[in-house]
């Protein structure tokens, strides 16, 4: 039986999750909550400037959208506790508004009748933060109801750090994410609490903050406090890159040794037999650029030619589609919860 899913917030991630999940026999999307009307939601689902036209049929009704003949209820509730998830038999809510990222607010979905909530961002005081391929085995269905899927950057970074830590032992490190602009920035100069994000996104390199590196400690506890990082938002709408430099305890003998560890890890994930692990890490030796990874479902695309080694100082780089790759992990996390009996 398919797991029933509701989506709260039908923005970039909400719609990408819908696309990634639609047609999968394990998942049935039954409802969407968003303050925008159904007509607009249907249009934005069908036509996407980055990911193209939706391959199925999409039409709007007064309080629903119809996709490939299946009607999906649309609500416009500001208070998550008022969304009738329970009446629809919803098992999991994808909390994708970017607003309800703390325990108090996310738990309102449980009041509405949902069994589990997955927050599509780093969260304040969730029951657990899960990064597939890194710490999913820590999930306990009986104890964990409010789950953070971390950020797109952490989902790229964590598998890479895991490989390095297991192979060489990470002493400390620093990450820079070269990140596509997002809706949290301004199209043209306009006030923002972050003065740099107030500047026009499509014509500037915008230095800003990221919690992705610090969040590693939540999924790899022995590295808590050992990593930090920063972000550079750049003028592309999708497709990002992490640049990671670490000091390791055991110096690798060569660049080739580092790359071989990633090649082996990518193969291990791919051949794991677990549907939710197949697309964690991809090994690439081609001289690619950001456009080449848009639409790539992997959490991290390791760029082997960019690896550098100086004694016990190791530098690696990995690409990620910050929308599609992350949304595919959301989909796979739902599947994983179902496999664990919710």
Swiss-Prot record:
The EC number(s) this enzyme carries: 1.2.1.12
MF term (GO), any: glyceraldehyde-3-phosphate dehydrogenase (NAD+) (phosphorylating) activity
GO biological process, one term: glycolytic process
Residues reported in the UniProt entry to bind NAD(+): 12-13, 34, 78, 120, 183, 322
Function comment: Catalyzes the oxidative phosphorylation of glyceraldehyde 3-phosphate (G3P) to 1,3-bisphosphoglycerate (BPG) using the cofactor NAD. The first reaction step involves the formation of a hemiacetal intermediate between G3P and a cysteine residue, and this hemiacetal intermediate is then oxidized to a thioester, with concomitant reduction of NAD to NADH. The reduced NADH is then exchanged with the second NAD, and the thioester is attacked by a nucleophilic inorganic phosphate to produce BPG.
Pathway: Carbohydrate degradation; glycolysis; pyruvate from D-glyceraldehyde 3-phosphate: step 1/5
Protein name per its UniProtKB record: Glyceraldehyde-3-phosphate dehydrogenase
Keywords noted in UniProt: Cytoplasm, Glycolysis, NAD, Nucleotide-binding, Oxidoreductase
Compartments where found: Cytoplasm
Keyword Iron-sulfur listed: no
Reaction(s) the record says it catalyses: D-glyceraldehyde 3-phosphate + phosphate + NAD(+) = (2R)-3-phospho-glyceroyl phosphate + NADH + H(+)
Pfam families per record: Gp_dh_C, Gp_dh_N
Cellular component aspect of the GO annotation: cytoplasm
Active-site residues, record numbering mapped to chain: 152 (nucleophile)
Site-annotated residues for Activates thiol group during catalysis: 179
Subunit structure: Homotetramer.
